[in-house]
């Protein structure tokens, strides 16, 4: 990601940081690592595969109950697929072909466990369905065969592979140009299921040249269900990190996604935002392409959407964009993102609060004007409250946001953070078991102590005003304990801080602390301050 940042910018940033241990490269690398971790998490809002399960009307109920009776009997070893069904499927009579394909489709639409394996293990059946896809003179047969194959492809990777190996994908792509909307929509659905299976399947579908016909369909369609399915399929084509899709093969969808962001349909908006979040997840060149498509202002507006399934992927996309360079980050700030992010910090959903903190941490890793913008938006008081009270995974992100600001901020900006009370919650993080966050907290405290040392020299008193605040927060005891930490960087940093800023070590200051497993941190006996106060 560093390649897009100008050398001049990096040199300026290096000089402006008070803490060379947390330089711009480290912060940028951290954003990548954190981003990967966030994107590995399971998303309940979006399914990568969808089965088409019909809503049964009364007229079909009797036939379906008979089918289900035969299906239930198959659990005793009797096959649900009869020899007669297979013979009728291979009949030359179009009416028999249609009726039997419909029977198979109904079986494959049953919840909760359709007999997919039995269907694909019956010789010739899947190939016959694929053959029926080519019957342009019989759109109903095409539709039923496409539906059956869609539900087979909604299963396991092995089941999806059977559909691919039968040669269905190029034919499904041709059917995107069908004159019949039902056939088009079912083809889109099948292709979405196949692309959603794995990066290998996704790339195969892309290499079969799906994008142009899919985008044409998206541009022309006036049917909401069709557009929803097409955007969902498109998001599956953009999804994945190991490896990501070839950007040149998916980036032509950006203008269409830009237009779709103005839909009023929540399902459609959610998948369009997920697609943009995937496309913006990567190096600065990808981020720039997303910015150039003109989506930023609308993405920021969607942060305030009343449906979390839209706000969440919009936040992910905005968060990815601000992992870029300072100029790219500024584009988001110029869209008035900070008031929206402040609003999201009080979301009822913990995952949204966490990602809002993560996004802000990438903004505070920017330049001093960007840190000031976060200050002016009154975000830091809320971040410090989160740092004290939230779930640990959210506290971690808030810690990054505050430490990044102490690393790149001006003396006045750091003093502002101290005035808000950032020292105590940073000291509290010194007892957690996550070594990376202990280092983040130590770096933040070191930046504050370094400023205090400069202020002591400037005032002529030689007294660092922040040493006392850290001692009052029992930070010194915790730093002393960290001198025996198993992580070399942590114990070295703790030793250096005590030696440089606190002078004499107090050997009796701490006994080995207990461990609180539920809070993922160590427990200290808090010593009472001596009557005359702490010695500086």
UniProtKB/Swiss-Prot annotation:
One Pfam family in the UniProt entry: IBB
Region called NLS binding site (major), residue ranges: 147-239
Start and end of every IBB domain?
Answer: 1-60
Q: Where is this motif: Nuclear localization signal?
A: 45-54
Q: Which residue intervals make up region (NLS binding site (minor))? A: 316-404
Sorted alphabetically, which InterPro entries does this protein's record hold? ARM-like, ARM-type_fold, Arm_3, Armadillo, Importin-a_IBB, Importin-a_IBB_sf, Importin_alpha
- Which tissues and organs express this gene's product? Widely expressed.
Q: Which domain of life is it from?
A: Eukaryota
UniProt keyword Metal-binding present = no
**Residues with the Phosphoserine modification:** 6, 113
Q: Where is the signal peptide?
A: none
One GO BP annotation of this record: entry of viral genome into host nucleus through nuclear pore complex via importin
Keywords, comma-separated and alphabetical: Acetylation, Phosphoprotein, Protein transport, Repeat, Transport
SMART domains, sorted: ARM (SM00185)
**Assembly:** Forms a complex with importin subunit beta-1. Interacts with ZIC3.
PANTHER family tied to this protein: IMPORTIN ALPHA
The entry's family comment says: Belongs to the importin alpha family.
Which named protein is this?
Importin subunit alpha-7
Which lineage ranks, top first, belong to the organism behind this chain? Eukaryota, Metazoa, Chordata, Craniata, Vertebrata
